[in-house]
Amino acid sequence: MISPLAYIHPEAKIGENVEIGPFVFIDKNVVIGDNNTIMPNANILYGSRIGNGNTIFPGAVIGAIPQDLKFRGEETTAEIGDNNTIRENVTINRGTAAKGKTIVGSNNLLMEGVHVAHDAIIGSGCIIGNATKMAGEIIIDDNAIISGAVLMHQFCRVGGYVMVQGGSRFSKDIPPYIIAGREPIAYAGINIVGLRRRGFSNELIENIHNTYRIIYQNGMNLSLIHISEPTRRS
């Protein structure tokens, strides 16, 4: 159902079984897939690409121009995958000439007031807490949990299966599988609960723990270490 009070540009492409509430604004050069729900007062702006099965709550703004003074109106996009929940007042900016696109994967929950800046990449299966702000060109790998009111500096990367504690702020990368928190942010152990929920065996979790013990006790620099996703065994 499409509300007669919504505005949809004639050049926008809308898939099948899409529910669009009153006072929704959908700009030109927008592509929206099937089975999406877009609630009242959401704005889907120029260059947005929305996959299938997403739920977009009131006040969300997707595809606004980047907050970057170097932006000169380049043809860039904000790309959203499938089955995401994007809550109230979330803002997802378009990319810049640097990378051309801002990407949010699939099966993510972005809670109220989250900001995703230009050229950011968020993987799949992530949870981003209320009022968390992510600067330009950050990367969040799959299955990470970023708690509420976290401030993430430009160019930082958060590894997969990480838990970042609420209210943290950081300007350096966070390696995978750990809990990070405190002020200044620091390693706070392995994300054991999160790893078990994702099917990691006790043996594998212990191997990850031992790896980080070696890294941190020897003062090693993570830039010299390659950490790949392990093969999980039941």
Where are the predicted features?
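Single conserved hydrophobic/aromatic residue that forms the stacking wall/gate
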Residues: 118, 226-234
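SDR active-site lid
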Residues: 184-202
